Amino acid sequence: MMSVNRFTSGRLPVFLRKSPFYYSRAYLHQTCVFKQNKETAQDSPELLAKSSHLNSKPLDVSNKAPVKTAQNKIPLAHSKYESSKYELPKWKEALGELVIRAFHLDMDRVRAGPVAGSYYYKICKEQGLQYEDEPLSETAKYFYEDLKLPRTFSQWFQITVLHEWILFVRMRAMPFKYGRNYQQKLVDRTFSDIELRLFEEMKVNSGRIADQYLKDFNTQLRGAIFAYDEGFATDDGTLATAVWRNLFGGRKNIDMVHLESVVRYIYSQLYVLSRLSDREFATGKFKFVPPGVKVEKLTPKQEEELKAKTIAKYEALDKDPKTLPSERSRLSYTN
Protein backbone atom coordinates (compact mmCIF):
# COMPACT_ATOMS: atom_id res chain seq x y z
CA MET A 1 0.00 0.00 0.00
CA MET A 2 1.79 3.14 1.16
CA SER A 3 3.33 5.01 4.06
CA VAL A 4 3.36 8.57 5.32
CA ASN A 5 6.91 9.09 4.03
CA ARG A 6 6.29 7.60 0.63
CA PHE A 7 2.77 8.07 -0.65
CA THR A 8 2.90 5.32 -3.22
CA SER A 9 -0.06 4.73 -5.45
CA GLY A 10 -2.03 2.27 -7.46
CA ARG A 11 -5.18 2.78 -9.47
CA LEU A 12 -7.86 5.45 -9.57
CA PRO A 13 -11.15 3.66 -10.18
CA VAL A 14 -12.08 2.83 -6.61
CA PHE A 15 -15.76 2.11 -6.28
CA LEU A 16 -17.62 5.33 -5.62
CA ARG A 17 -21.32 5.53 -5.16
CA LYS A 18 -23.81 8.09 -3.99
CA SER A 19 -24.76 7.49 -0.39
CA PRO A 20 -28.53 7.20 0.01
CA PHE A 21 -30.01 8.14 3.33
CA TYR A 22 -30.05 4.45 4.23
CA TYR A 23 -27.87 1.72 2.78
CA SER A 24 -26.15 -1.52 3.72
CA ARG A 25 -22.95 -0.88 5.62
CA ALA A 26 -19.61 -1.54 3.99
CA TYR A 27 -16.67 -2.03 6.32
CA LEU A 28 -13.18 -0.69 5.71
CA HIS A 29 -10.01 -2.39 6.89
CA GLN A 30 -7.14 -0.44 8.41
CA THR A 31 -4.60 1.14 6.08
CA CYS A 32 -2.14 3.97 6.46
CA VAL A 33 -4.81 6.25 5.03
CA PHE A 34 -7.96 4.91 6.65
CA LYS A 35 -7.08 4.66 10.33
CA GLN A 36 -10.55 3.66 11.50
CA ASN A 37 -11.02 0.19 12.97
CA LYS A 38 -12.54 -2.30 10.58
CA GLU A 39 -15.55 -2.62 12.88
CA THR A 40 -16.42 1.03 12.19
CA ALA A 41 -18.96 1.56 9.43
CA GLN A 42 -18.30 4.41 7.02
CA ASP A 43 -21.00 6.88 6.08
CA SER A 44 -20.13 9.62 3.64
CA PRO A 45 -18.70 12.82 5.21
CA GLU A 46 -21.87 14.67 4.25
CA LEU A 47 -24.18 12.19 5.98
CA LEU A 48 -21.95 12.19 9.04
CA ALA A 49 -22.11 15.99 9.29
CA LYS A 50 -25.89 15.94 8.94
CA SER A 51 -26.24 13.24 11.59
CA SER A 52 -25.17 15.57 14.41
CA HIS A 53 -27.93 16.02 16.99
CA LEU A 54 -26.55 19.30 18.34
CA ASN A 55 -28.26 21.44 15.71
CA SER A 56 -25.55 24.08 16.11
CA LYS A 57 -26.05 27.53 14.65
CA PRO A 58 -24.06 28.77 11.64
CA LEU A 59 -20.78 30.46 12.53
CA ASP A 60 -20.65 34.21 12.04
CA VAL A 61 -24.10 34.32 10.47
CA SER A 62 -23.92 38.10 10.15
CA ASN A 63 -20.94 37.90 7.79
CA LYS A 64 -21.97 36.49 4.44
CA ALA A 65 -19.74 38.48 2.12
CA PRO A 66 -19.70 36.57 -1.17
CA VAL A 67 -16.36 35.38 -2.47
CA LYS A 68 -17.39 35.98 -6.05
CA THR A 69 -20.01 38.09 -7.80
CA ALA A 70 -22.48 36.56 -10.23
CA GLN A 71 -22.23 39.53 -12.57
CA ASN A 72 -18.49 39.20 -13.17
CA LYS A 73 -17.54 35.55 -13.55
CA ILE A 74 -13.88 34.92 -14.33
CA PRO A 75 -13.19 31.17 -14.09
CA LEU A 76 -9.49 31.60 -13.33
CA ALA A 77 -8.21 34.65 -15.12
CA HIS A 78 -8.79 36.64 -18.30
CA SER A 79 -6.84 34.12 -20.37
CA LYS A 80 -8.92 32.43 -23.04
CA TYR A 81 -6.54 29.46 -22.95
CA GLU A 82 -8.04 28.27 -19.67
CA SER A 83 -11.57 28.15 -21.00
CA SER A 84 -12.94 24.61 -21.27
CA LYS A 85 -14.27 25.51 -24.74
CA TYR A 86 -10.95 26.72 -26.13
CA GLU A 87 -9.26 24.61 -28.79
CA LEU A 88 -5.71 25.25 -29.91
CA PRO A 89 -5.46 25.96 -33.66
CA LYS A 90 -4.10 23.00 -35.61
CA TRP A 91 -1.03 24.89 -36.83
CA LYS A 92 -0.08 25.86 -33.27
CA GLU A 93 -0.58 22.30 -32.12
CA ALA A 94 1.63 20.98 -34.93
CA LEU A 95 4.31 23.59 -34.21
CA GLY A 96 4.28 22.70 -30.54
CA GLU A 97 4.74 19.00 -31.26
CA LEU A 98 7.64 19.84 -33.58
CA VAL A 99 9.38 21.93 -30.90
CA ILE A 100 8.91 19.20 -28.29
CA ARG A 101 10.42 16.57 -30.58
CA ALA A 102 13.27 18.79 -31.84
CA PHE A 103 14.44 19.96 -28.41
CA HIS A 104 13.60 16.73 -26.54
CA LEU A 105 11.57 18.64 -23.99
CA ASP A 106 10.73 16.89 -20.74
CA MET A 107 6.94 16.97 -20.90
CA ASP A 108 6.63 15.88 -17.29
CA ARG A 109 8.15 19.23 -16.29
CA VAL A 110 6.34 21.25 -18.94
CA ARG A 111 3.02 19.64 -18.03
CA ALA A 112 3.22 20.94 -14.45
CA GLY A 113 1.97 24.36 -15.54
CA PRO A 114 -1.29 23.39 -17.23
CA VAL A 115 -2.01 20.47 -14.89
CA ALA A 116 -1.03 21.77 -11.44
CA GLY A 117 -1.13 25.51 -12.13
CA SER A 118 -4.40 25.45 -14.02
CA TYR A 119 -6.46 22.27 -13.66
CA TYR A 120 -5.57 21.27 -10.10
CA TYR A 121 -5.87 24.84 -8.86
CA LYS A 122 -9.24 25.09 -10.56
CA ILE A 123 -10.66 22.05 -8.79
CA CYS A 124 -9.23 23.21 -5.44
CA LYS A 125 -10.73 26.65 -5.92
CA GLU A 126 -14.14 25.35 -6.90
CA GLN A 127 -14.73 23.27 -3.76
CA GLY A 128 -15.74 26.29 -1.69
CA LEU A 129 -16.58 28.71 -4.48
CA GLN A 130 -19.86 30.59 -4.26
CA TYR A 131 -21.66 33.12 -6.41
CA GLU A 132 -23.84 35.91 -5.15
CA ASP A 133 -27.57 35.20 -5.55
CA GLU A 134 -26.91 31.73 -7.00
CA PRO A 135 -27.44 28.27 -5.46
CA LEU A 136 -24.39 26.68 -3.87
CA SER A 137 -22.76 23.65 -5.45
CA GLU A 138 -23.11 20.33 -3.63
CA THR A 139 -19.58 20.58 -2.23
CA ALA A 140 -20.04 24.20 -1.19
CA LYS A 141 -23.27 23.22 0.60
CA TYR A 142 -21.28 20.70 2.62
CA PHE A 143 -18.86 23.35 3.84
CA TYR A 144 -21.24 26.29 4.27
CA GLU A 145 -24.50 24.59 5.23
CA ASP A 146 -23.64 21.19 6.71
CA LEU A 147 -20.50 22.38 8.52
CA LYS A 148 -22.01 25.85 9.02
CA LEU A 149 -18.85 27.72 8.05
CA PRO A 150 -19.11 31.47 7.36
CA ARG A 151 -19.41 32.51 3.73
CA THR A 152 -16.41 34.81 3.53
CA PHE A 153 -13.38 35.27 1.32
CA SER A 154 -11.04 34.12 4.09
CA GLN A 155 -13.10 30.98 4.65
CA TRP A 156 -13.01 30.19 0.94
CA PHE A 157 -9.22 30.51 1.11
CA GLN A 158 -9.02 28.00 3.98
CA ILE A 159 -11.19 25.52 2.07
CA THR A 160 -8.93 25.94 -0.96
CA VAL A 161 -5.78 25.46 1.13
CA LEU A 162 -7.15 22.23 2.63
CA HIS A 163 -7.63 20.78 -0.85
CA GLU A 164 -4.23 22.00 -2.01
CA TRP A 165 -2.59 20.26 0.95
CA ILE A 166 -4.37 17.03 -0.01
CA LEU A 167 -2.78 17.32 -3.46
CA PHE A 168 0.60 18.24 -1.94
CA VAL A 169 0.64 14.90 -0.11
CA ARG A 170 0.41 13.08 -3.44
CA MET A 171 2.83 15.41 -5.21
CA ARG A 172 5.53 14.70 -2.63
CA ALA A 173 5.36 11.02 -3.54
CA MET A 174 6.33 11.80 -7.13
CA PRO A 175 10.01 11.88 -8.14
CA PHE A 176 11.41 14.93 -6.35
CA LYS A 177 12.13 17.20 -9.32
CA TYR A 178 8.62 16.69 -10.69
CA GLY A 179 6.71 16.78 -7.42
CA ARG A 180 8.44 19.96 -6.29
CA ASN A 181 7.66 21.60 -9.63
CA TYR A 182 3.98 20.66 -9.40
CA GLN A 183 3.73 22.08 -5.88
CA GLN A 184 5.39 25.34 -6.92
CA LYS A 185 3.11 25.79 -9.93
CA LEU A 186 0.04 25.25 -7.75
CA VAL A 187 1.19 27.77 -5.13
CA ASP A 188 2.21 30.36 -7.74
CA ARG A 189 -1.17 30.15 -9.42
CA THR A 190 -2.98 30.40 -6.10
CA PHE A 191 -1.45 33.75 -5.23
CA SER A 192 -1.64 35.20 -8.74
CA ASP A 193 -5.36 34.43 -8.76
CA ILE A 194 -5.89 35.81 -5.25
CA GLU A 195 -4.15 39.04 -6.25
CA LEU A 196 -6.44 39.32 -9.28
CA ARG A 197 -9.52 38.74 -7.16
CA LEU A 198 -8.48 41.24 -4.50
CA PHE A 199 -8.40 44.01 -7.09
CA GLU A 200 -11.33 42.99 -9.29
CA GLU A 201 -13.78 41.39 -6.86
CA MET A 202 -12.91 42.64 -3.39
CA LYS A 203 -12.30 46.15 -4.79
CA VAL A 204 -8.94 46.63 -3.06
CA ASN A 205 -7.53 49.77 -4.67
CA SER A 206 -4.21 50.02 -2.83
CA GLY A 207 -1.21 47.96 -3.87
CA ARG A 208 0.19 48.24 -0.36
CA ILE A 209 -2.99 46.83 1.17
CA ALA A 210 -3.10 44.05 -1.43
CA ASP A 211 0.51 43.12 -0.61
CA GLN A 212 -0.36 42.92 3.07
CA TYR A 213 -3.29 40.63 2.30
CA LEU A 214 -1.03 38.41 0.19
CA LYS A 215 1.53 38.20 3.01
CA ASP A 216 -1.21 37.25 5.45
CA PHE A 217 -2.56 34.57 3.11
CA ASN A 218 0.97 33.24 2.58
CA THR A 219 1.43 32.93 6.35
CA GLN A 220 -1.92 31.14 6.64
CA LEU A 221 -0.95 28.74 3.86
CA ARG A 222 2.39 27.83 5.44
CA GLY A 223 0.85 27.39 8.87
CA ALA A 224 -1.99 25.23 7.58
CA ILE A 225 0.32 22.98 5.55
CA PHE A 226 2.59 22.42 8.56
CA ALA A 227 -0.38 21.66 10.83
CA TYR A 228 -1.99 19.22 8.39
CA ASP A 229 1.35 17.49 7.82
CA GLU A 230 1.79 17.04 11.55
CA GLY A 231 -1.71 15.64 11.89
CA PHE A 232 -1.32 13.23 8.99
CA ALA A 233 2.02 11.99 10.35
CA THR A 234 0.71 11.42 13.88
CA ASP A 235 -2.92 10.59 14.58
CA ASP A 236 -6.53 11.53 13.88
CA GLY A 237 -6.78 13.70 16.99
CA THR A 238 -3.87 15.88 15.87
CA LEU A 239 -5.30 16.13 12.37
CA ALA A 240 -8.70 17.10 13.77
CA THR A 241 -6.98 19.78 15.86
CA ALA A 242 -5.32 21.15 12.72
CA VAL A 243 -8.70 21.22 10.98
CA TRP A 244 -10.21 23.05 13.96
CA ARG A 245 -7.43 25.66 14.06
CA ASN A 246 -7.44 26.36 10.34
CA LEU A 247 -10.69 25.42 8.62
CA PHE A 248 -12.83 26.32 11.66
CA GLY A 249 -10.62 29.23 12.72
CA GLY A 250 -10.15 27.92 16.27
CA ARG A 251 -13.70 29.00 17.15
CA LYS A 252 -15.38 27.91 20.36
CA ASN A 253 -18.35 25.55 20.58
CA ILE A 254 -17.44 23.57 17.47
CA ASP A 255 -19.49 20.44 16.82
CA MET A 256 -17.10 17.47 17.18
CA VAL A 257 -19.15 15.51 14.65
CA HIS A 258 -18.30 18.17 12.08
CA LEU A 259 -14.59 17.76 12.80
CA GLU A 260 -14.91 13.99 12.42
CA SER A 261 -16.72 14.52 9.13
CA VAL A 262 -13.89 16.65 7.72
CA VAL A 263 -11.25 14.14 8.85
CA ARG A 264 -13.20 11.39 7.09
CA TYR A 265 -13.47 13.60 4.01
CA ILE A 266 -9.69 14.07 4.01
CA TYR A 267 -8.96 10.35 4.33
CA SER A 268 -11.40 9.57 1.51
CA GLN A 269 -9.53 11.91 -0.84
CA LEU A 270 -6.14 10.53 0.21
CA TYR A 271 -7.26 6.96 -0.37
CA VAL A 272 -8.36 7.74 -3.92
CA LEU A 273 -5.07 9.55 -4.55
CA SER A 274 -3.16 6.54 -3.22
CA ARG A 275 -4.73 4.45 -6.00
CA LEU A 276 -3.33 6.72 -8.71
CA SER A 277 -0.01 6.07 -10.39
CA ASP A 278 2.44 8.94 -10.87
CA ARG A 279 1.58 9.18 -14.55
CA GLU A 280 -2.16 9.26 -13.98
CA PHE A 281 -1.87 11.94 -11.33
CA ALA A 282 0.63 14.03 -13.30
CA THR A 283 -1.64 14.07 -16.34
CA GLY A 284 -4.65 15.33 -14.39
CA LYS A 285 -6.63 12.12 -13.94
CA PHE A 286 -7.91 13.08 -10.49
CA LYS A 287 -11.07 14.75 -9.25
CA PHE A 288 -12.05 15.33 -5.64
CA VAL A 289 -14.62 12.91 -4.31
CA PRO A 290 -17.85 14.79 -3.49
CA PRO A 291 -18.66 14.81 0.24
CA GLY A 292 -21.92 12.96 -0.43
CA VAL A 293 -20.08 10.00 -1.95
CA LYS A 294 -18.82 7.07 0.08
CA VAL A 295 -15.39 5.58 -0.70
CA GLU A 296 -15.02 1.83 -0.30
CA LYS A 297 -11.67 0.08 -0.10
CA LEU A 298 -10.82 -2.14 -3.06
CA THR A 299 -10.36 -5.85 -2.53
CA PRO A 300 -6.98 -7.40 -3.46
CA LYS A 301 -8.60 -8.96 -6.52
CA GLN A 302 -9.99 -5.63 -7.67
CA GLU A 303 -6.59 -4.03 -7.09
CA GLU A 304 -4.88 -6.57 -9.33
CA GLU A 305 -7.50 -6.28 -12.07
CA LEU A 306 -7.32 -2.50 -12.18
CA LYS A 307 -3.54 -2.53 -12.07
CA ALA A 308 -3.40 -4.94 -15.01
CA LYS A 309 -5.77 -2.76 -17.05
CA THR A 310 -3.75 0.37 -16.33
CA ILE A 311 -0.45 -1.27 -17.25
CA ALA A 312 -1.91 -2.60 -20.49
CA LYS A 313 -3.29 0.84 -21.36
CA TYR A 314 -0.03 2.74 -20.89
CA GLU A 315 2.16 0.04 -22.42
CA ALA A 316 0.06 0.27 -25.56
CA LEU A 317 0.25 4.07 -25.48
CA ASP A 318 4.05 4.07 -25.17
CA LYS A 319 4.48 1.56 -27.99
CA ASP A 320 2.08 3.31 -30.36
CA PRO A 321 4.12 5.29 -32.95
CA LYS A 322 1.15 7.63 -33.41
CA THR A 323 1.35 8.86 -29.82
CA LEU A 324 2.22 12.56 -29.91
CA PRO A 325 5.37 13.81 -28.14
CA SER A 326 3.22 15.96 -25.84
CA GLU A 327 1.35 12.84 -24.68
CA ARG A 328 4.45 10.91 -23.66
CA SER A 329 5.76 10.65 -20.11
CA ARG A 330 8.66 9.12 -18.20
CA LEU A 331 6.68 8.77 -15.00
CA SER A 332 5.71 5.36 -13.72
CA TYR A 333 2.28 3.86 -14.31
CA THR A 334 2.94 0.72 -12.25
CA ASN A 335 3.42 2.23 -8.77
Curated annotation (Swiss-Prot):
It is found in: Mitochondrion membrane. The chain crosses the membrane at residues 152-169. GO terms for cellular component: Cbp3p-Cbp6 complex; mitochondrial inner membrane; mitochondrial membrane; mitochondrial ribosome; mitochondrion. Its main location: mitochondrion. It holds the Pfam family Ubiq_cyt_C_chap. GO terms for biological process: mitochondrial respiratory chain complex III assembly; positive regulation of mitochondrial translation; protein stabilization. InterPro entries: Ubiq_cyt_c_chap, Ubiqinol_cyt_c_chaperone_CPB3. It comes from the Eukaryota. Residues 1-38 form a transit peptide. Keywords: Chaperone, Membrane, Mitochondrion, Transit peptide, Transmembrane, Transmembrane helix. GO terms for molecular function: mRNA binding; ribosome binding. The keyword Protease does not apply. Belongs to the CBP3 family. Present with 14200 molecules/cell in log phase SD medium. Chaperone required for the assembly of ubiquinol-cytochrome c reductase of the mitochondrial respiratory chain. This is Protein CBP3, mitochondrial. It comes from Saccharomyces cerevisiae (strain ATCC 204508 / S288c). The gene is CBP3.
